[in-house]
């Protein structure tokens, strides 16, 4: 019987030691990671067709932007990307903006410079 008592004392000492330093032990089960909530984006409520105020803003402000892309116009005027592309085509045909680069996925325009426009047309002719 005395050996059993010794084991109990040793076990009691071990369990007390385990309770003391659970953090410093490298073995054992790690805490399970909780799933984080994903970032919630606000729903964009962009216009599908122009109203009078937005169209006037397009005609007045957009030709003064240094960098004009469908993404920039869409974000600033709160219109759909397809509407922004069509609007920029119209401004280009009116001669209010100048094409810088055209690619399948990205079109870049800039404002018309007053001095730089005439010599460029003269060189082409």
Swiss-Prot record:
Record's keyword terms, sorted: Acetylation, Cytoplasm, Ribonucleoprotein, Ribosomal protein
Domain of life: Eukaryota
GO MF annotations in UniProt: RNA binding; structural constituent of ribosome
Modified residues (N6-succinyllysine): 52, 94
GO cellular component, one term: cytoplasm
N6-acetyllysine PTM sites in chain numbering: 43, 52, 60, 66, 94
InterPro entries: Ribosomal_eS25, WH-like_DNA-bd_sf
Record's compositionally biased regions (Basic and acidic residues): 1-23
Compartments where found: Cytoplasm
Disordered as annotated region, ranges: 1-38
Basic residues: bias regions: 28-38
GO biological process, one term: translation
Gene3D superfamilies the record matches: Winged helix-like DNA-binding domain superfamily/Winged helix DNA-binding domain
Similarity section: Belongs to the eukaryotic ribosomal protein eS25 family.
Assembly and oligomerization: Component of the small ribosomal subunit.
Function noted in UniProt: Component of the small ribosomal subunit. The ribosome is a large ribonucleoprotein complex responsible for the synthesis of proteins in the cell.
Name of this chain's protein: Small ribosomal subunit protein eS25
């Amino acid at each position: 019987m005395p050996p059993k008592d010794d084991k109990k004392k040793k076990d009691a000492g071990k369990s007390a030691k385990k309770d003391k330093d659970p953090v410093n032990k490298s073995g054992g089960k790690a805490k399970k990671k909780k799933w984080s909530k994903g970032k919630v984006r606000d729903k964009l409520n962009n216009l599908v067709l122009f109203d009078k105020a937005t169209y006037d803003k397009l005609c007045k402000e957009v030709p003064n932007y240094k960098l004009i892309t469908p993404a920039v116009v869409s974000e600033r005027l709160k219109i759909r990307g397809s509407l922004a592309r069509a609007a920029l085509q119209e401004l280009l045909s009116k001669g209010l903006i100048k094409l810088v680069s055209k690619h399948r996925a990205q079109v870049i325009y800039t404002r018309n410079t007053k001095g730089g426009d005439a010599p460029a047309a003269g060189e082409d002719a």
